[in-house]
Amino acid sequence: MSKFVKKIKIIKPDDWHVHLRDNEILNQVIKYTGKFYKRAVIMPNLNSPITSCLKSIAYRNRILKSMHLNYKFKPLMTCYLTNSTSPKELEFGFSKKIFVAAKFYPNGCTTNSKTGIKKISDITPVLECMEKIGMPLLIHGEEINQNIDIYDREAKFIEKTLDPLRKKFPKLKIVLEHITTKESVEYIKNNDVNYLSATITPHHLMLNRNDMFYGGIQPYLYCLPILKKNKHRMALRKAISNGDKHFFLGSDTAPHLHKNKINMLGCAGIFNAPSSLLSYVKVFEEMRALKHLQSFCSENGPKFYNMPINKETITIIKKPCKIIKKINIGRNVIIPFLSGEILNWSIESD
């Protein structure tokens, strides 16, 4: 596509990694996902994690009840894996389309992961079942150990956990989520796209770790996996700009109340739903790779999940769009990524 492109029409995208939270936060943030995306994979790490079919059905009903009339989408539910997860529960949930995937959180890796897995070998029967039935395993890929530098956790995870896992279960479908490193890009590109893929967030494509400390600590840029060196950001950008089928859209939008982002122990997570799609467009434009935007946003994900590609389209136009400054949650607020900033692209109204 020419650098002078003023309008882009693509198949309506899906977001393959979304945190909606619950209750009042859910009610206020949900429309921003619905505005841009047809389907969304919903993360299960609530305060009370989604560990069963019954919990998933109840949470999905709360999501559907909260949806904005004009911004509806299909929530795709996931199961939070624990040492108590039953293979039969997973198989039943997957067969009945209650779950589209199961999520592996290493213990202590991120928000609400205290009941996550300490050793992946502890859930071998679950993984055997998932490989057998073709159920995707979604992975937060960080090796959690106080002796491992936080900037090295993702690379160490590939070496110590992911590579042995794939050798043991070669036909287990795996999504390495929100990748942040050159090592992840290289490892994934060298493996079968039918069994290993990755999602990439807009903030890891746009920022490096210097941004988190520019002019002082920037709590709203603190996320996990943490922002990395610029060489890693450039590896991510190169991966998507080449049209590689291994990579697809997963925003990892993660809302937290302002007071919880700026307190003594600030929460990890970036709420980017109001700007995520437009941010991806910005990156693809900068990389002169707009011809690959549709495959990354709308095609690679459903192909990996063996789901139909959406029939609807969305039109993006070269028109300034100001990102909302804040979202009110009772007496509290949530501040979105790129709050108050102006992006060069907008969604064309019907």
Curated annotation (Swiss-Prot):
Keyword Zinc-finger tagged: no
Pathway(s): Pyrimidine metabolism; UMP biosynthesis via de novo pathway; (S)-dihydroorotate from bicarbonate: step 3/3
Disulfide bonds: none
Modification N6-carboxylysine, positions: 103
Binding site for substrate: 19-21, 45, 140, 224, 256, 268
Binding site residues for Zn(2+) 2: 103, 140, 178
CDD domains membership: DHOase (cd01294)
Note accompanying the cofactor annotation: Binds 2 Zn(2+) ions per subunit.
Annotated positions binding Zn(2+) 1: 17, 19, 103, 252
Gene Ontology CC terms: cytosol
Cofactor: Zn(2+)
Record InterPro entries: Amidohydro-rel, DHOdimr, Dihydroorotase_CS, Metal_Hydrolase
A GO term, aspect molecular function: dihydroorotase activity
PROSITE patterns noted in UniProt: DIHYDROOROTASE_1, DIHYDROOROTASE_2
Record Pfam families: Amidohydro_1 (PF01979)
Active site per database record: 252
GO terms of biological process kind: 'de novo' pyrimidine nucleobase biosynthetic process; 'de novo' UMP biosynthetic process
Record's catalysed reaction(s): (S)-dihydroorotate + H2O = N-carbamoyl-L-aspartate + H(+)
Keywords: Hydrolase, Metal-binding, Pyrimidine biosynthesis, Zinc
Quaternary assembly: Homodimer.
Function description: Catalyzes the reversible cyclization of carbamoyl aspartate to dihydroorotate.
HAMAP family cross-referenced by the UniProt entry: PyrC_classII
Family: Belongs to the metallo-dependent hydrolases superfamily. DHOase family. Class II DHOase subfamily.
Name of protein: Dihydroorotase
Naturally occurring in which organism (per UniProt): Buchnera aphidicola subsp. Acyrthosiphon pisum (strain Tuc7)
Taxonomy of the source species: Bacteria, Pseudomonadati, Pseudomonadota, Gammaproteobacteria, Enterobacterales
